[in-house]
């Protein structure tokens, strides 16, 4: 008998532990090399653990919901066993297969709308399945990729939940709760995911550790919009990506950070660490919550490079494919609440960074130019900063530098 250990993959230095989500194989079942055995969740990403070798899954050491650390053994595979040897074990439950009706009854609670894993959510969207049409077998009823594949391949399974079609509004609720089934004054206690718990912890840490102050300014977006409208078609044809506004905000931020290095610095104990590089975090929404992937060396990136990377981050965040490396580090962050219609906000600093820029919705507003009232597309900028190391002067002038660069994009080319 040759036994191979299945171990938790390497986690980043900032991730101490992970949670086992859902085993896709049972002891005694045959596995192929690189076949996904389980998904584990860290406070940053969901990782898929593949089988290191082909064989038979002989022992599961860690169960769903268990907390594990990097390199910890979670299962063992017998590489000398064959699929044929595993067949008797798989055949044993055959009598249960003759009674599918109870299984359908058990699946009914899933109509409450189990939380779909990122990989499952993509498959469900492609197959036109709602959460109420898929029975979640993961922890706390979570819908796994295997659940989504099974539901998509079974036409009968799609037709069964038809009575639940009268409750489409439940799909707008993020919690996996069927409130209609809980009485007149419903409540449901749902445990936080590891990512949500980590977000809560870091936000509280930021509020309690940093001396947060926010400065505001308004920017006339007409010059950027005119430039974009003039070149957007040629830009997309040349670079294969649409010219958005975030690349201009990133460039304007880097422009200001070069002028005011303290905004790009961080505190380490009693020291101020000045970073000679510009790694810009871009806040991105995902099915699991807000994540902040990093644009490395943003000062060396073109507008096209930035737009391509942000688009890539959006797809990866939606599919749960962002790597730990992409989510680690950063010297400054940008949060764009404008995509949701936000007019104004006070963003919270992402530790250990010392500042964050909040971008909002661009709206036509009356402004005074040369004594005349004119209509201009205006955007309110908000920069929160750690007042422990950044004085008001640097913060205000830094935000003004961003404003000036956006109102005269030629400054970005001339480095003025």
Curated annotation (Swiss-Prot):
Its cofactor is (R)-lipoate. Its EC number is 2.3.1.61. Binds 1 lipoyl cofactor covalently. Residues 3-78 form the Lipoyl-binding domain. Keywords: Acyltransferase, Lipoyl, Transferase, Tricarboxylic acid cycle. GO terms for biological process: L-lysine catabolic process to acetyl-CoA via saccharopine; tricarboxylic acid cycle. InterPro entries: 2-oxoA_DH_lipoyl-BS (IPR003016), 2-oxoacid_dehydrogenase (IPR050537), 2-oxoacid_DH_actylTfrase (IPR001078), Biotin_lipoyl (IPR000089), CAT-like_dom_sf (IPR023213), E3-bd_dom_sf (IPR036625), PSBD (IPR004167), Single_hybrid_motif (IPR011053). It holds the Pfam family Biotin_lipoyl. Residues 115-152 form the Peripheral subunit-binding (PSBD) domain. Pathway: Amino-acid degradation; L-lysine degradation via saccharopine pathway; glutaryl-CoA from L-lysine: step 6/6. GO terms for cellular component: cytosol; oxoglutarate dehydrogenase complex. The modification N6-lipoyllysine is found at residue 44. The active site is at 387, 391. It catalyses: N(6)-[(R)-dihydrolipoyl]-L-lysyl-[protein] + succinyl-CoA = N(6)-[(R)-S(8)-succinyldihydrolipoyl]-L-lysyl-[protein] + CoA. E2 component of the 2-oxoglutarate dehydrogenase (OGDH) complex which catalyzes the second step in the conversion of 2-oxoglutarate to succinyl-CoA and CO(2). Forms a 24-polypeptide structural core with octahedral symmetry. Part of the 2-oxoglutarate dehydrogenase (OGDH) complex composed of E1 (2-oxoglutarate dehydrogenase), E2 (dihydrolipoamide succinyltransferase) and E3 (dihydrolipoamide dehydrogenase); the complex contains multiple copies of the three enzymatic components (E1, E2 and E3). Belongs to the 2-oxoacid dehydrogenase family. This is Dihydrolipoyllysine-residue succinyltransferase component of 2-oxoglutarate dehydrogenase complex. It comes from Cupriavidus necator (strain ATCC 17699 / DSM 428 / KCTC 22496 / NCIMB 10442 / H16 / Stanier 337).
């Amino acid at each position: 008998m040759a036994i191979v250990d299945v171990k938790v993959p390497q986690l980043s230095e900032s991730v101490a532990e992970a949670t086992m989500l859902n085993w896709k194989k049972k002891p005694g079942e045959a596995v192929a090399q690189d076949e996904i055995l389980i998904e584990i969740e860290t406070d940053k990403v969901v990782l898929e653990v593949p089988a290191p070798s082909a064989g038979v899954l002989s022992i599961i050491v860690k169960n769903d919901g268990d907390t594990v650390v990097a390199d910890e053994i979670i299962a063992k595979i017998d590489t000398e066993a064959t699929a044929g040897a595993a067949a008797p074990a798989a055949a044993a439950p055959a009598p249960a297969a003759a009674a599918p009706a109870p299984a359908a009854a058990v699946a009914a609670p899933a109509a409450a709308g189990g939380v779909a894993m990122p990989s499952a959510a993509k498959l469900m969207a492609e197959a036109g399945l709602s959460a109420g049409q898929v029975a979640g077998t993961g922890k706390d009823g979570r819908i796994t990729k295997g659940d989504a594949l099974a539901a998509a391949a079974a036409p009968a399974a799609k037709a069964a939940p038809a009575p639940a079609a009268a409750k489409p509004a439940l799909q707008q609720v993020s919690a996996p709760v069927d409130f209609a089934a809980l009485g007149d004054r419903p409540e449901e206690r749902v445990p936080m995911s590891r990512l949500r718990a980590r977000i809560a912890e870091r936000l509280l840490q930021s509020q309690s550790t940093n001396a947060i102050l926010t400065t505001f300014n308004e920017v006339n977006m007409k010059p950027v919009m005119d430039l974009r409208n003039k070149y957007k078609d040629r830009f997309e044809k040349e670079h294969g990506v649409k010219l958005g506004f975030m690349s201009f905000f990133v460039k304007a931020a880097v422009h200001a950070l070069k002028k005011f290095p303290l905004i790009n610095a961080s505190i380490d104990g009693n020291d101020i660490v000045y970073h000679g590089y510009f790694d810009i975090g871009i806040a991105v929404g995902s099915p699991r919550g807000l994540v902040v992937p990093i644009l490395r060396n943003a000062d060396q990136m073109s507008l096209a490079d930035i737009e391509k990377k942000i688009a890539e981050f959006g797809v990866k965040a939606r599919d749960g494919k962002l790597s730990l490396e992409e989510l680690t580090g950063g010297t400054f962050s940008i949060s764009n609440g404008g995509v949701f219609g936000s007019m104004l906000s006070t963003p919270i600093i992402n530790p250990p960074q010392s500042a964050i820029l909040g971008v909002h919705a661009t709206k036509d507003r009356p402004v005074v130019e040369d004594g005349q009232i004119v209509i201009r597309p205006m955007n309110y900028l908000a920069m929160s900063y750690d007042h422990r190391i950044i004085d008001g002067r640097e913060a205000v002038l830094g935000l003004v530098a961003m404003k000036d660069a956006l109102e005269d994009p030629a400054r970005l080319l001339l480095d003025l």
